[in-house]
Structures are given as structure tokens and as C-alpha cells.
Amino acid sequence: MKKITPLFLVLVLSLALFLPMGCKETGGGNEYGATLLNYRLKESFLKENPVYGVAYTNERYDPAEDNGEFPYLYDETSPANRTFVITEKEQAENIFEDNFIDYDKIDFQKEFFIIYLYASYNEYKKIITDAAKDENGVLKITFESVCSSGSETPIPIQNSVVIKINKTDFEAVEITAKHVNK
């Protein structure tokens, strides 16, 4: 009996340590296999696609001289968010940092990417809570962006969500972000 107890303890500890590593957080109601990915976007892509409310670095600001410029400029003219549907490898190569994606493991015949750009304070966790198509063919994806209260950055930044999803026909894509403070 004493040999079983240490073995059982090792098994339980192993499961507790390694089981969460293989899980992808997608939440419920996800019939299209929508998965959040941690792919890095090219700086040039982000600069070409600004979003409203973000504090961007002011290129004309020089701390050595008092030229009346501020270190940051808040975008007040761009859209509040931007959504991109990536269905081909060539598109992806122009958007993703090359060292963060293995194109040999992506089958663009069976899956595609959706990129959503928006302004936010730093989040530590994003979870897809729903991915479904409505009666009009609109692919609706909802995700939670969780931020620990008190850990926000002092200025809004341009944030992104990269979603890999099974190929499906749709008329439009609608993404909803629910911000949750914990």
C-alpha cells in the first residue's frame, strides 16, 4: 500500500503540471475550431493600420530640445478597430513575423486567419467565448480580454488578436471584445 501512495502522488502532480500546457483556451460555443494564436505581427503592418485612441510615438518629438511636441500622439481619425481575413500564404507572409510562424503546418485549404486590431490597455489573457455563424451568414466571434485591475498601462496601446479558424463560407466577420477586470 505504501508503494501505491507515492506513485499516485507523482501521477497527480504530473497531471497538474503538464495537462494545462496542452490546452488551448477557446471557451464554449466554438463550432468552427476558433483558436487564439500568439503570432507576432510585423511592425510595418501595424503602422499601416492604426486604430482610434492609441497613443503612438511622435516621430518629431526630441527630448533634447523644447520644440513644443509631445512624446505621444493620440489617434483620433482612424477606425476604432480593424478586421482582416487571411486566406492565403502570401497574405500571411506580409503580415506575420517570419520567425513566429511555421507555414508548413498551415493548410490554407482547410483553415484561415482572422486578425483583429483594437486599442486597449495591456491584457494578460484572451479567451474565445463564442464563434458561430448567424442566419445571415455573418461569422460572429466573441472573446474576453482579461486585465488584472491595477496592472493597466498608463496609455492605450494598439493590441491584436490572431484567430485560426476552420474554413467556412461567410458573408462578413464581426468580432466583439468583452473587457473583464479581475
Predicted regions span which residues?
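Positively charged n-region of N-terminal signal peptides that target proteins for export
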Residues: 1-6
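Generic alpha-helix initiation/capping and coil-helix boundary signal
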Residues: 7-9, 85
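Enrichment for repetitive, rod-forming helical segments
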Residues: 9-10, 163
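Bacterial N-terminal signal peptides
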Residues: 10-20
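Exposed, flexible binding/inhibitory loops of compact, secreted disulfide-stabilized domains
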Residues: 23-182
